[in-house]
A protein has these predicted regions:
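Mid-chain, well-packed structural core segment of small domains
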Residues: 80-108
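Vicinal oxygen chelate
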Residues: 2-59, 66-79, 101-144
């Protein structure tokens, strides 16, 4: 049985120029969501997620989509998740995006209506997520 294609094999070799978006954006239609950065230092307004051995901050308040993560020594998460930054992307079909990838955190639901998984791609941690249900997009400047 043939192995399923990886992102590297789907995207092929490429050389991106300064003005071009990454190939997962231009070729696959993925959309940037946030970047997660592990830290050893306590941060303001941390939320403790006991099941993950994790203190998280910044996700809902950073204008740039930066999430800070401080892990406990006994965190059950994959070592790469605890030590490497990740970039999270929205996708239209999580199952299709995960096909053939090295999944290091199985699809789960970080919040209502969202599914997310973490994968290793060429040694880098990436998060892919989709929305089970999406509400209407509200332009808050126009709403008020």
């Amino acid at each position: 049985m043939a192995s399923k294609p990886t992102l590297s094999s789907i995207l092929g070799s490429f050389h991106r120029r300064d003005h071009e978006p990454p190939p997962v954006v231009s070729k696959l239609g993925w959309r940037y969501h946030h970047v997660g950065i592990p830290t050893d230092s306590p941060r303001p307004n941390e939320t403790h997620l006991e099941a993950f051995g994790l203190h998280v901050s910044g996700f809902s308040t950073s204008p740039f989509g930066i999430e800070w993560m401080r892990y406990s020594d006994d965190s059950p998460l994959h070592p790469a998740i605890k030590t490497m930054p990740h970039v999270a992307f929205e996708v239209d079909d999580l199952d299709a995006a995960l096909e053939g990838q090295e999944i290091i955190y199985s699809p789960g639901s970080p919040s209502e209506g969202v599914r997310a998984a973490m994968i290793l791609v060429d040694g880098d941690v990436e998060v892919v997520r989709d929305y089970v249900r999406r509400g209407p997009i509200i332009d808050y400047d126009q709403a008020w």
